[in-house]
Amino acid sequence: MPFPVPDPFVWDTSFQVFYFELDEKHRGIFQALFALGNDNNPSNLKLLYRVTANHFAEEEGFMQTANYGGYRSHKVLHEDFLAKLRSFKAPVPDKDVYFAKDWLVQHIKTIDFKYKNLL
């Protein structure tokens, strides 16, 4: 069963992976998506892509350093999501903003939670 998308769309402790740097980056993606949802313009779309790509690179670095077994499949999910974000054009349709919010929630709570205590 999918996890609910919070409304308002803000990070809370239910999303903690317990690695400070990664939690802060997740919080930043939430903030960027919230901004895009409230002011749907090219600048906020670029911000969302930038903070997401930066976070994915950092998270993947943690995984590689720890020889995390799920690294390759996790990286593919990141690449697919970044490709989807690159396909967006501002103003982004509401359904696509919701898709990104839902993807982030499900990804953190099902995929990222698998690396807790392993990095």
Curated annotation (Swiss-Prot):
Q: Which residues bind Fe cation 1?
A: 26, 55, 59, 112
Task: For this UniProt record, give its keywords in alphabetical order, as a comma-separated list.
Answer: Iron, Metal-binding, Oxygen transport, Transport
Per the record, the domain of life is Eukaryota
Where, in this chain's numbering, is Fe cation 2 bound? 59, 74, 78, 107, 112
PROSITE patterns assigned: HEMERYTHRINS
**InterPro entries for this protein:** Haemerythrin, Haemerythrin_Fe_BS, Hemerythrin, Hemerythrin-like, Hemerythrin-like_sf, Hemerythrin_metal-bd
A GO term for molecular function: oxygen carrier activity
Function of the protein: Hemerythrin is a respiratory protein in blood cells of certain marine worms. The oxygen-binding site in each chain contains two iron atoms.
Record-stated family: Belongs to the hemerythrin family.
NCBIfam families under this entry? hemeryth_dom (TIGR02481), Hemerythrin (TIGR00058)
Mind telling me what this protein is named?
Hemerythrin subunit A
